[in-house]
């Protein structure tokens, strides 16, 4: 009895080797304690070590892709050695679909894995960027100000067009703009199994390639048992989310079917910035012992009131005279000026026409197949098709009929050359192709992967005038412009990883990519389009990982990436500037990783050196498409930290930080000067060693989690983002101020008879009511050598809340 207090306070360990039935060890297997949030992975010899454990009863859970998850009940009285042999899985796991393009513990790549549980506890109906906001170097923004509708994400200062997104290994980025439109897939987070974020170039993948990072998404994996879920959220700005999820579980251990139906509505923080979003997800799969066939169909429909004009600086500051001057410069009508003067400082929306909306529907079809031929050779492939169609509608005052290819009209006793009108600008596109990957494990220390993809995109761009004050002889269905964009994208890659000694893992990754992009027809300004460019890219990557011990390793890598210009780089090109060129990136990464029971730590440094980088100039066109221009030499260098530590059974802390220097060696700024005769000339200004636009020097995040009793968790989330310049002149009169925002998340899980789980959740965003802007734009014009600069900002909501009630059956 005297020894009992000593025993209960003692710290013990569990260690051992994880192997398969043939006695071959399994490096990379996951070992965790049931009911605990920490775990470890096996080293190159299949060894694991759980330390600093109190005496007591534990359930050890061991999992590895392709093998059955095993649980072992243990009574811990002293240091324990527990060797475990895993049996092959009775069916092939869905993870094989994404393995070819993912990083792992041996990869010399900077990455972070985000589990289904982490996604779901932060899923209150906001778009995926806001759910991923607590990861290193990430900055998010919302046009409507509250995370629903049009949202954006940047990683290491790079916008969405430089973040390569794949869903089950299939490219998601729009082929022409290279952007990511999460509004087209509302509540997609409810159908995600896990996400891997790779920062920097990362591994070879399918799509246009990463210039800042990659999001590798795997959708829902099968549940062992049948289930039903009903998830509901209501909150500020009349935000409402309803989600129904159903699944059969495994039928005869071979078949599974899953489905989801969602709707999200929100009025938005910005005036009239309402969203009406609907989506569904259906999946059916056959699970053989050595093969997997899965069919996915998912779709999103959105109707979003436009809020992409931003707020003029004078309105944001409440500067009445500045607003009057701005109205005069813009040629506002009296009604438009009064609307500006009488709106809220932080909620102003220039659009007032009731149907000034963006309307789009997108349907995705995926057929995924994987085959494990033996313990050395496996194969997976996918066929996919996406069709999308939609338009945005606009009311326009006093438009020249000639801009729409229309003749003058006789009306009101005079010849009318201008008219008020309503127009629709359409996009109708198709995207289809195939991906594949072969994996050959020659021996325990040597692995080969060969894969690639071929995809085609066909896009139609056209406009219609559906109403005019002075109607012409044209019909509503007539197109006043017609443009096409055709893109063929082929890539193939080979990867090899080799461990010459136990502690060292080397890799080489070689990719060839060929792109043909053809633009034809006329654009929205009735200009002729005729581009037909073919690009050939070679993207090599090399790296090494050295394991210091079971818990820690060092890694370093060198990668090359190339990327073609997007459609807007051609169509937004200013008169007198050269055609856009493809850009190249040399990325150097080095880091240290440490993982044990309670502490998970990653630190890394990076250098990203660009040739001909296409950089935001700070301007946008009338549809919020950003202007970009090539700069000869530029770079991003930085330090990143990602850590989590379990302080006790009640407290845990997560922290991340990114500190960077983002510079352009020589930057030429172009300002358009308008002459009295209607001609345009360019005024140039030269700058040296300026900061790259939208690239904060510091991004710091943290989360303190408190679990006082079973089922309840509270998390205080904090985010600091340093100042960002709106353009590349490093002018303090054109910047976003630094901001520090804190959110509070509460969750309580409990059970009642007949219901497996009930979850009550509360998310209070911006609890200290920080007034901040996360995005903006700027442009300058000149007349008689007098330059005028206009700044616009996207204000984010103050304190707001989302309350959720979720049921699992």
List PLM regions with ranges:
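Short acidic/polar hinge/loop motifs at secondary-structure boundaries
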Residues: 51-52, 120, 171-199, 218-219, ...
């Amino acid at each position: 009895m005297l020894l009992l207090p000593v025993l209960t306070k003692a710290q013990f360990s569990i260690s051992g080797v994880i192997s398969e039935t043939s006695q071959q060890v399994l490096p990379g297997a996951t070992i965790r304690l049931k009911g605990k949030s920490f775990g470890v992975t096996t080293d190159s010899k299949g060894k694991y070590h759980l330390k600093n454990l109190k005496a007591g009863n534990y359930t050890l859970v061991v999992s590895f892709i392709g093998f059955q998850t095993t649980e072992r009940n243990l009574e811990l009285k002293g240091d324990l050695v527990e060797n475990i042999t895993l049996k092959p899985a009775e069916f092939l796991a869905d993870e094989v679909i994404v393995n070819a393009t993912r990083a792992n513990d041996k990869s010399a790549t900077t990455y972070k894995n985000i589990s289904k549980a982490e996604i779901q506890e932060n899923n209150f109906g906001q778009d995926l960027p806001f759910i991923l906001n607590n990861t290193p170097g990430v900055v998010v923004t919302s046009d409507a100000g509250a995370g629903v509708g049009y949202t954006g994400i940047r990683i290491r200062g790079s916008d969405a067009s430089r973040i390569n997104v794949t869903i089950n290994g299939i490219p998601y980025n729009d082929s022409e703009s290279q952007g990511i439109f999460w509004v087209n897939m509302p509540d997609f987070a409810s159908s995600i199994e896990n996400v891997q974020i790779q920062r920097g170039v990362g591994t070879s993948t399918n799509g246009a390639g990463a210039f800042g990072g990659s999001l590798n998404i795997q959708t829902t994996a099968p549940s062992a048992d049948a289930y039903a879920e009903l998830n509901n959220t209501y909150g500020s700005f009349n935000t409402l989310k309803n989600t129904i999820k159903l699944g059969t579980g495994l039928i005869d251990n071979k078949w599974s079917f899953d489905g989801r139906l969602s709707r999200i509505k929100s009025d938005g923080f910005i005036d009239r910035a309402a969203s009406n979003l609907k989506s569904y997800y259906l999946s059916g799969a056959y699970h053989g012992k050595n093969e997997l066939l899965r069919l996915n169909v998912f779709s999103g429909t959105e109707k979003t009131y436009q809020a992409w004009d931003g707020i003029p600086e004078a309105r944001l500051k409440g500067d009445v005279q500045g607003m009057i001057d701005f109205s005069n410069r813009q040629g506002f009508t009296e009604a438009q000026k009064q609307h500006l003067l009488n709106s809220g400082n932080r909620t102003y929306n220039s659009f007032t026409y009731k149907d000034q909306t963006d309307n789009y529907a997108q349907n995705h079809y995926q057929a995924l197949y994987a085959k494990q031929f033996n313990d050395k050779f496996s194969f997976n492939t996918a066929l996919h098709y996406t069709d999308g169609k939609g338009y945005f509608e606009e009311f326009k005052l006093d438009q020249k009929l000639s801009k729409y290819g229309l003749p003058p009209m006789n009306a009101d006793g005079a010849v009318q050359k201008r008219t008020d009108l309503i127009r629709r600008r359409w996009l109708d596109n198709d995207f289809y192709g195939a991906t594949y990957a072969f994996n050959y494990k020659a021996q325990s220390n040597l692995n080969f992967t060969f894969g690639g993809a071929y995809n085609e995109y066909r896009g139609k761009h056209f406009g219609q005038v559906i109403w005019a004050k002075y109607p012409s002889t044209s019909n509503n269905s007539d197109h006043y412009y017609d443009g096409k964009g055709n893109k063929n994208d082929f890539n193939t890659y080979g990867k090899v990883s080799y461990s010459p000694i136990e502690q060292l893992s080397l890799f080489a990754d070689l990719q060839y990519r060929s792109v043909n992009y053809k633009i034809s027809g006329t654009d929205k300004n009735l200009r002729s389009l005729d581009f037909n460019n073919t690009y050939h890219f070679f993207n090599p990557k090399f790296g090494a990982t050295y394991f210091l011990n079971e818990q820690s390793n060092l890694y370093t890598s060198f990668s090359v990436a190339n990327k073609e210009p997007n459609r807007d780089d051609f169509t937004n090109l200013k008169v007198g500037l050269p055609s856009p060129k493809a850009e190249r990136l040399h990325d150097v990464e080095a880091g240290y990783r440490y993982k044990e029971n309670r502490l998970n730590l990653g630190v890394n440094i990076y250098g990203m050196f660009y040739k001909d980088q296409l950089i935001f100039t700070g301007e946008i066109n009338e549809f919020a498409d950003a202007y970009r221009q090539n700069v000869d030499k530029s770079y991003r260098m930085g330090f990143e930290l990602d850590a989590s530590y379990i302080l006790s059974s009640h407290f845990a802390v997560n922290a991340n930080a990114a500190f960077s220097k983002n510079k352009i060696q020589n930057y030429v700024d172009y300002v358009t000067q308008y002459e009295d005769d209607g001609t345009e000339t360019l005024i140039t200004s030269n700058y040296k060693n300026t900061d790259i636009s939208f690239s904060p020097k510091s991004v710091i995040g943290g989360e303190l989690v408190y679990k006082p009793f079973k089922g309840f968790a509270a998390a205080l989330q904090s985010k600091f983002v340093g100042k960002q310049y709106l353009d590349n002149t490093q002018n303090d009169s054109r910047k976003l101020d630094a901001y520090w925002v804190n959110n509070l998340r509460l969750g309580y899980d409990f059970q009642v008879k007949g219901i497996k789980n009930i979850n009550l959740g509360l998310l209070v965003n911006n609890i200290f009511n920080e007034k901040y802007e996360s995005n903006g734009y700027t442009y300058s014009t000149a007349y008689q050598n007098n330059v005028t600069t206009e700044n616009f900002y996207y204000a984010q909501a103050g304190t707001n809340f989302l309350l959720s009630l979720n049921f699992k059956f």
